[in-house]
Regions:
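Conserved HGGG/HGGXW glycine-rich cap/lid loop of the alpha/beta-hydrolase fold
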Residues: 5-52
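Short beta-strand/loop motif that positions the catalytic acidic residue
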Residues: 195, 201-203
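Catalytic histidine-centered segment of alpha/beta-hydrolase-like enzymes
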Residues: 233-245
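Active-site loop/oxyanion-hole signature of alpha/beta-hydrolase fold enzymes
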Residues: 41-82
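Conserved alpha/beta-hydrolase catalytic His-Asp/Glu region
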Residues: 116-118, 136-191
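Gly/Ala-rich beta-loop-alpha elbow adjacent to hydrolase catalytic centers
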Residues: 83-87, 91
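Conserved alpha/beta-hydrolase "acid-adjacent" motif
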Residues: 208-214
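Flexible "cap/lid" loop of the alpha/beta hydrolase fold
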Residues: 96, 104-133
Length: 258
């Protein structure tokens, strides 16, 4: 696992964890905007981006690696943790592993209720069409369609280049493992109730029902959690495509005194 850093490392630390299939650049724009006040750390999960040759194991293993980094490089504590989809689930696990690891946490569109049937369908889809879906030609087409159909959410050229570099080298076994762990089997740990972090849990209005149910379950088990429904949006839109809207929502949360 690699880590990209932005800002002065004497400032409060914020760790932002990308979703499955993407890489550190998922939060690149937010990191740059936050870096004048914070030291922002963007991990590259095993099996993703420049770490594509490393085997992705599980949410728990990823959380352990990030926890070790925080112990070694941040004196065991960060100001905030954040993550989208798989990254948000890793945040949940980190909060469960260490009740006082962070003052704040931002989770976006993450599951904590197992969905084995959905995982089986997703794995079947990847096995049948994965190589076609993530070919360079297909990725170029996806970016063109995004510009045409959703210009507000289109990537800038820099992120397009990262996308075209990283997505075609994503191995199908990595996606299958993610579906088997993130989607099919991960359950919220009882220890989450001991976490002292203040949590903002974001989900899109158009998310699947299981994501909304996960948000409600998390709030039931973690009593210092505020839910936010992003009206009109689908899975992970604020974190992945709309960094300015993400900043408008998250900045007051980060700056608010408890």
């Amino acid at each position: 696992m690699k880590f990209h850093e932005f800002g002065d490392n004497h400032n409060p630390h914020i760790v932002l964890i990308h979703g499955g299939g993407n890489s550190w650049w998922n939060y690149l724009r937010q990191a740059r905007l936050l870096s004048d006040k914070y030291h922002v750390i963007l991990p590259v999960l095993d099996g993703h981006g420049e770490e594509f040759q490393k085997e992705y194991v599980s949410t728990e293993q990823s959380a352990q690696e990030i926890l070790e980094y925080i112990k070694d490089q941040c004196d065991g504590h960060v100001f905030a943790l954040g993550g989208v989809s798989l990254g948000g689930q890793i945040v949940m696990e980190l909060l469960s592993l260490d009740a006082h690891i962070a003052d704040k946490a931002i989770i976006d569109g993450s599951l904590c209720i197992p969905q084995p049937k959905l995982a089986k369908m997703s794995i079947l889809l990847v096995k049948c069409f994965g190589k076609l879906m993530f070919s360079k030609a297909a990725c170029k087409m996806q970016l063109k369609l995004m510009k045409k159909m959703y210009p507000k959410m289109a990537y800038p050229e820099e992120l397009e280049n990262y996308y075209l570099e990283d997505m075609p080298r994503l191995q199908m076994k990595t996606l299958i493992t993610i579906y088997n762990t993130y989607m099919a089997s991960y359950q919220l740990k009882p220890a989450i109730s001991d976490s002292s972090a203040e949590v903002l849990y974001i989900y899109g209005e158009k998310e699947m029902k299981c994501v909304k149910e996960s948000a409600k379950l998390f709030q039931q088990m973690h009593h210092n959690c505020m839910l936010y429904e992003a009206k009109g949006y689908n899975h992970g839109y604020l974190s992945t495509y709309l960094p300015l809207e993400w900043m408008e929502l998250v900045t007051p949360f980060l700056e608010r005194e408890e």
